[in-house]
């Protein structure tokens, strides 16, 4: 098997998960979704984060509404399953690590600015079918995985990378799931 830089980095992250001890989350506040500003238009070009993601990730040129601020159609690969989507109204932009989960694993004390950065981080945003997003909800990696193995392995690697990037706790049950699943994934 040929190893890419991403594969090697994922292996390093997986190895560190096996030996590191999870840190207890200091959850002192209740999760309130409105405390996490999302779909921001930080560059003030009338395209919010959702529109930016749809435009950037389309496999074809997108069609926009008359004002040019909302994406109508394009061609997107689903992150969780081997499907292609063509209508923007039929897809969700999902937070790979759900906002509520981040809140419960170390982000509860973040500033509003830090929460906004996380909620709009393209690395944590994926395109998927609405029903898959609803099935996943705020579940962690120990409660939900894509059914398709190839997609599960990428999901695990991205989950670990984002947890590491944002210094979020990997719960003991997550670690157990990661340890058992990484044997099936070829990193």
Residue ranges with predicted function:
Residues 43-44, 52-55, 59:
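Extracytoplasmic c-type cytochrome modules immediately beyond a signal peptide or single-pass transmembrane anchor
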Residues 25, 59-73:
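A charge-rich, low-complexity, intrinsically flexible signal that marks solvent-exposed coils, linkers
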Residues 2-10:
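Sec-dependent signal peptide recognition
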Residues 15-16:
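C-terminal motif of bacterial Sec signal peptides marking the signal peptidase cleavage site
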């Amino acid at each position: 098997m040929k190893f890419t830089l991403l594969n090697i980095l994922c292996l390093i992250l997986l190895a560190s998960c096996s030996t590191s001890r999870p840190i207890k989350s200091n959850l002192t506040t209740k999760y309130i979704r409105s405390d996490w500003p999302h779909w921001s238009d930080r560059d003030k070009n009338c395209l919010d984060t959702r529109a930016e993601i749809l435009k950037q990730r389309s496999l074809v040129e997108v069609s926009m509404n008359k004002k040019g601020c909302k994406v109508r159609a394009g061609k997107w690969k689903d992150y969780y399953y081997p499907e292609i989507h063509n209508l923007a109204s039929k897809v969700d932009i999902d937070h790979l690590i759900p906002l509520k989960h981040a809140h419960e694993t170390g982000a509860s004390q973040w500033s509003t600015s830090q929460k906004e950065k996380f909620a709009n981080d393209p690395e944590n945003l994926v395109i998927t079918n609405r029903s898959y997003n609803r099935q996943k909800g705020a579940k962690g990696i120990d409660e939900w995985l894509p059914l398709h193995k190839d997609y599960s392995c990428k999901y695990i690697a991205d989950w670990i990378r984002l947890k590491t990037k944002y210094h979020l706790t990997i719960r003991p049950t997550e670690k157990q799931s990661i340890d058992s699943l990484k044997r099936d994934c070829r990193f």
